[in-house]
Amino acid sequence: MNRGPASRIRIGLALACAGLTAGCGTQAATVAVTRPPAVTAPLSTSLTTAQGTWAIAVMGGSAASHNNFWQLFVRRANTGRWSLATPEGVADNGGLVAAGGNGSLVVGFRPSQELAYSPLATSTDAGLNWTPGLLDAALADTPGAIAVGPSGRTLALLQDGTIEAAPTADDAAAGRWTPLATLKALAASAPGRSCGLKGMTAVSFGPDQNPIAAGSCVRPGVAGVFTDAGGTWRSAGLTLPGNGPSMGTVRVLGLTAIPGGNAALLAVGTSLLAAWWDGTRWTVSAPVTADGVRALGFGPGGSAWLLLDSGQAETIAGAAGSTWRALPPVPAGTTVLAPPGTGTLAPGTGGSYDALAVSGSRLTVWRLARGAWGKVQQITVPVQYGSSG
């Protein structure tokens, strides 16, 4: 595979990052309540844009030896083949976070080792070339840490719960970020106090293009989803029905913009649910029971998928009244699923889910067709073991 175009950003990223200082943050609020069980959404995920379908997975070896390398793959629109698209020039041991914009994809590098800030990279040609960007702070350890609006306005959720905003994509690339909200301020606001906000997990944009933030709350049955209206944060009104899993505390694991609204993935104890918002009301799915999540993500039209610790995979279409559908047992080593893209795949690709399985530096792509997984592609990634030790 030709990696020439991407390699041109190596020097640019290195120079852009050299001038940054260590990120600083706001101390999280202290609340005298019992913290709910910690559930962290894994960074392994996939998303769809007009350019294609993207997947993030960790490859290599032990994280303790810094031999874990996060990689970005793309299945470009109107094709059924995957390609390696990881921006070069920055250590990615800390993980990658990505968000699609209007004809672009923004990737953020989480800090690792001595790196205390999060370099960015943006592509407008489906990952063939990347432009470096700056964020003088550490991105949160969650797949929803970046959001890009149709106008190019960009949000970043930091590790300490602060939300920063850049007015345009150019401002984000130039490092012109300003604080939008802090965890302390959101927790002290009326909706934050009402739900007992404890932490932030995702950012997005609502149907009115105003920022949305989501997190974890300690009040049973109430989800911490907030909308920004001219600097005043209000509850988005996501409350689960008054029986069943809603009796537990709610954690928002994922949040994304969809046409006319938003979609969210929620954890309530050992139950996982999807929810959709049209700007006025929420629709909540029936629950799926699971002890843990290996990966999760969203697809076109508010669809969503879950890869559970048991190896079971569940998908939901996103339409009102839709229910979770179990996929056949995924192949061994599967770390992430990828939904059908917004465009039509090449003839014979089936238009169904792909399962991306990792073994060391080898990625194997399996495609679901007629109720069974079939191997369709294999990619060997040039992992540089020992380069980050």
Annotate each language-model stretch with its function.
Residues 20-23:
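C-terminal motif of bacterial Sec signal peptides marking the signal peptidase cleavage site
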Residues 25-27:
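Bacterial signal peptide processing site
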Residues 35-72, 91-97:
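Beta-strand-rich domains and repeat architectures in extracellular enzymes and scaffolds
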Residues 39-48, 90-101, 138-150, 188-205, ...:
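Repeated scaffold domains used in trafficking and secretory/extracellular systems
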Residues 49-57, 102-108, 151-156, 205-214, ...:
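Entry beta-strands of beta-propeller and related beta-repeat scaffolds
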Residues 59-66, 110-116, 161-163, 216-221, ...:
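Short glycine/acidic-enriched loop and turn motifs that connect beta-strands
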Residues 75-77, 123-124, 164-170, 226-230, ...:
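Conserved Ser/Thr-centered positions that define the repeating blades of beta-propeller domains
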Residues 83-89, 131-136, 175-185, 234-240, ...:
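Beta-propeller fold detector
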